[in-house]
Amino acid sequence: MSRKLSHVLLIGVGLFSSTWVMAAVKEYDLTIAEQTVNITGKPLKRITVNGKFVAPLLEFEEGDDAVIRVHNKLKNQDSSIHWHGLILPGIMDGVPGFNQFDGIAPNKTYEYKFKVRQNGTYWYHSHSKGQEQDGLYGPLVIYPKNKVPLTAGEKADRDYVVLLSDFHNSTSGQIMSNLKKEADYYQNRRETVFDVFRQIKRDGLKATWKDRSMWNQMRMLKTDMSDVTNYTFLMNGKTPEQNWTGNFKAGEKVRLRFINASAMSLFDVRIPNLKMTVVSADGQPVKPVPVDEFRIGTAETYDVIVEPKQANYQIEAESIDRSGFSIGTLHDENTSPVKSIVMPTPRPRALLTMEDMGMNHDMSSMKGMDHDMSSMKGMDHDMSSMKGMDHDMSSMKGMDHDMSSMKGMDHDMSSMKGMDHDMSSMKGMDHDMSSMKGMDHDMSSMKGMDHDMSSMKGMDHDMSSMKGMDHDMSSMKGMDHDMSSMKGMDHDMSSKTMSSSGSDEVVYGWANASTPAGLKALQYSDLQSLTPQKDTRAPEREIEIRLGGNMERYIWTINGKKFNETEPFKVKYGERIRLKFVNDSMMAHPMHLHGMFMQLENGQDPSNMPNKHTVIVPPGKTVTTLLTADELGEWAIHCHLLYHMSAGMMNKLIVANVDSNSTDSKDVVAQPNTNDKGVNQHAHH
């Protein structure tokens, strides 16, 4: 054998050995089944994975070849698993109806195979019906090769996943059915007449009436921060009473990988008396940001480093509707056993404002919304028929209400029996109503006032007759979605509280987390990519994604259409585009893109913009991202609030290899290749 040939063979063997060493095969078997679980003291049938609720942690290293066999043992239900935030071939993404993937039939097995091309904190969940809510979700962590930290600042002695989720005693199917019957079905913390009086005292009667008239005409609730309530919030599958605990020793650094795996809940996260340093967002490394708290949207992830010094710290994740907490403990294992948790006092709940609707209180700008109440058939607006509502105005001491001058108000107040609201305590409220001429105070439209309407004879509550009340606000011209202060959503969490604490107190504005003075809450504008972005091109074009809905029928839309009515977004492979999310609704939407990372336009230089797979779009606001379409396939883009997606807020983004009009599968669907050495530039650092 010649020396030259021997040299070539040695090189070949060396390359093969190197490839073999670097590309370890990591295999898992996951069995999906229905079993009885007991989370809240009531045995319930829920979905388990490998007999566990919640599903087990999956761990990989960057460069591994993942082989995951999923066995569906559910009766009469197809299933699926989506690998949330992972860059992989489209057919491995796990969304039925996309990329020629049909789901996993009962008693069948599907083998997911893909190259692990990134590192970071991610998770996995079903993309079939409401199975995610019912238990099919779990954490997924990818370590850098050989678990070497990316920076010295990320080096930690302990590493814990903190999986936040919401558990309901009703199944996902029951919840969706209830929302379809009545969108406000779970709104059990509506405002009362006393909230109205508090607003009058603060803003004055005229401003209060104007504000509430607009909300009533839209038939929306200021309290609608979350569509579904009555959740028990879990941390790593444990209730607050069960108290998940992570141990440490004095002097150690601890990495906490927060994952919001809830179906419908956003959380404000804090560890009182312990500073956190954010080092990763959505699995992607960012420059360190010291914070005291952060808001985490559904499907987002944040990694933080902490250096605990006390014996115990309580991890608190409070739902933004202030209905409960997910709680756990950090405990110094060399000290006495941790005591039972202390339930924190809820922070004041936030009420939505007209600014959250992007309207600046000018109803004339709401073109496209038909507020002609004459279409509300069956509603007798003669207030004399509203028996059971006793508003004795004579008891409102100190309030100079000359009712005779209130033209346009035909309300026989004497007949409103049964509402025992003693106004005698409202002294000092001098509201001259003579200036309120011409105001049509149709009190029958005061939705959101928690009064039993069963006694209000003559009112037909069949809302199907309310023609023209389509809450898809994409047609509401004149709505000023001011982006100047947003740049990708700046969560102004400064405290504007009416009181220091207490669940009955309120603050105003979706973004108001009641952060105590002097403490730092993470803003989207704080996030910078740890390493410079490789693609800083300006976008070639913009795709507008308007988020709206019709609350009377509980329908959620993108650009005015439900998923089954939409045309896919089509993008050329390699194209640089801007995605413009415009929220025309009164609720926040965490918008998630499969298959690729977006760069959030948050005021940072293009080279420093952070990568995100999910962005919160607050009510009435606009958020923009940049995207390099460098992954072939059909990719879901949707709201990650489960019931919003199920009700229609979803579309398909097709990245094609040829012209943008092609949908030929051979040009779109990238087949799996476990030897793929390509690296997505937005996922690898």
Walk through the language-model features, giving the residues of each.
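C-terminal soluble interaction/assembly domains
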Residues: V571, I577, V582-M591, M596-N657, ...
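A cross-kingdom feature marking solvent-exposed beta-strand/loop segments within repeated
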Residues: V95-Q100, T277-E307, K562-E565, G603-T624
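Extended intrinsically disordered, low-complexity coil regions enriched in Ser, Thr, Gly, Ala
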Residues: M92, L266-K287, D321-D332, A588-N611, ...
